[in-house]
């Protein structure tokens, strides 16, 4: 196994690192597309993120990396084993980094059902694909713009639904497919269709660092890593462990992060004022804002969370706006949000929105 360059030692590219971290906190955000020239640490950052994440518990013989503590997400295979009274052993493993080749076919991605065996022996046999291996891990697609559009659609559907269902000749098989989706591409080699571009929750455009001092630092760290990979990794172990713990803690509280009606109005007003098509962006901003609040250890979102989420969620979704001439900044978005909130402040007082609406209604009664 080749040594992995530490995530926290990557110089600059803060937006890219932030987008990866927030997807690690909550994979339900829906992945990140990283666009940039060659040699800007795109694949390095993705591999480093997978290595950074804490170990997970899985069933020993399951090819689907099922979570032993989440029965409602178990694959059909685990359900069948449990129904037969089998005791499945549990072990810990490092989160998997799954690299999808550009030549991947639909069957290679989703897996295949053996129809002949089902007809002859009455047995349901499923050969797992890439989505099975990537469950609860990180799925990396280099040059995603060169991948078959239909395959990209399948991947994005699975990332959004969190489950892969394969159906052939009246036979079906389902397994969890919740993963951190990271796609990278060089825009010079062609872009994604707008329909597919919108399906990536977050998008970051990165460039080579122009500051001479930072370029020197990049050279120094890369040379140190090449000469002594293990020593370099040990040097960066403390910040790596700190970030890993912070992500793990954020994962435990992200579902408890609350938001107000005013926050929802701010998000909706922002996307409407920027002529964003559809409603996917609104939901992505909310999920990303909650993940950022959880990452900072807070239980409610604020204007900065929304602005930061919008900075990562909107640039690739806006067709006609100043964002096409100048790079969007979090400060610009936060200022716009404050203006929108000021315009709507007199209309209604913010009311706390709890995830458990039914429970909230009971409390009001």
Regions found by a protein language model. Give the residues of each.
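Short, flexible loop/turn segments with low-complexity composition
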Residues: 63, 231-236, 323-324
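C-terminal engagement/docking regions of AAA+ P-loop ATPases
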Residues: 41, 268-280, 291-365
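Short leucine-rich amphipathic alpha-helices used at interfaces
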Residues: 123, 129, 173, 234, ...
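Short, intrinsically disordered/low-complexity patches at protein termini
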Residues: 41, 57-58, 66-70, 189-190, ...
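Short alpha-helix boundary/capping motifs
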Residues: 44, 48-52, 62, 74, ...
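Short flexible/disordered coil segments
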Residues: 109, 182, 244, 339-345
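Basic, amphipathic alpha-helical bundle interface domains used for macromolecular binding and assembly
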Residues: 151-152, 210-318
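Conserved ASCE/P-loop NTPase catalytic core
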Residues: 1-213
